[in-house]
Structure formats: C-alpha cells, structure tokens
Amino acid sequence: MQQKLEDKHVHKGLRKQMVDLLREKGITDESVLTAINAVPRHYFLDSAFVTHAYEDRAFPIGEGQTISHPHTVAYQTQLLQINKSEKVLEIGTGSVYQATILAEMGARVYTIERQKKLYDLHKDYVFKAKYPTIKFFYGDGFEGLPTYAPFDKIIITAAAPFIPPKLVEQLKQGGIMVLPVNEGDGDQQRMIRISKDANGEITEESFDIFSFVPMLTGKNR
C-alpha cells in the first residue's frame, strides 16, 4: 500500500480514461462505471505498482494473490446486477478493491479471505469509515457464511474447480451468483452466472473466458 494516500487530479483523469476503456470493452452498466470512477484503485496497490494503477492489468498483492484487471472487476459486477442495500457475499477479499466497488454501489458486503496475512491487513482498510457496510471474515470460501445467509448476490473472485453447492444453498430465491469455473486443465475459466428463481430452481449461463488464481479449500495461516 502507499505510505501517503492522495487522490490527485492526475489520478482522477487516469481513472476516467480507464472507465472510457471499460466502456469500449463492452461494460454498459453506468452504475458499475460510476462506482469504478469513484474509487481510487491506486490506494489498493503496493507502491511499486501505483504508477500503473489505471492500466487494465492485474497486480500481485502478496500471498500468491492478485488484484484483478479493472475489466474483470467491471465484468463480474455487471453480471451481478447489483441493487442498493442488497446483501452480497464475496469469496476472496484480496485487496478489498472489489468489495469497495460493491459498497460504493450501495451493497452490504460480507467478504471472506482464507489467507490470514491478507485478512490481518484488512483492519487497516483505508475506507473503513466511508464503507462501514463491508464486513470482513477469515474463513473457507467453499463453506460461505451460513450464519448470515441467505444472500441476494454472491461473487467468487478466484478460479473455482466446480460450482460450490454450499454457496448455491446460501443464495436467496431470486438471487444471482457469479463465478469463474475451471475449463480443461484449469489454466482458464469460464465466467458463469447462476440464477435461483422463486421456486429455488437453478439456471446457469456461460459467458467469456478469464484467468484467475485458484480458489482453495480451508484457511491458510
């Protein structure tokens, strides 16, 4: 993270250029673009990468994890169809950037991180006062948070080997889950959207190919 956090005109200008690029790449949900334009991505990166914060690139954040490409964040968020005040479960807190975008859109975010070192950093989350609706948990993403279920929306930000059944159970009727699921040898993932109707029936839609770090079981200390 940066030692001194400032959001200058140059950052805002670069952020607007990034949003324009996302629009060119097919992101059409203005609420998603507005949220991305409002959140300073450079706050979530190691100082070594700050000058590249508004390029459409992923960057390492430690513990073998990354902050996703802005296009990936926008793509998943658009598929979620977020409405204000919805309760959203995020699997893979990482840098907290995705959770912050969701909170900026008015969601109440419950986010799980399995890497203890990353989880411990979340106590210093820079926007804690601005987004008190983000709740942090240390745990196994495959288990979800049954105590807090059901959730209106669920987002998984790591490559799932399969659609986790416990997370489908925790999805509210009328809810949506978006996740990347391994294809072939697992080097790439197909983005999947799961919808649960009022009768609890599941519909699965397939979208584009992406590349994520793997979703792992258990908790890593």
State what each model feature region is:
Residues 1-89, 97-101, 105, 118-120, ...:
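Class I SAM-dependent transferase core
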Residues 81-203:
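Conserved nucleotide-cofactor-binding alpha/beta core module
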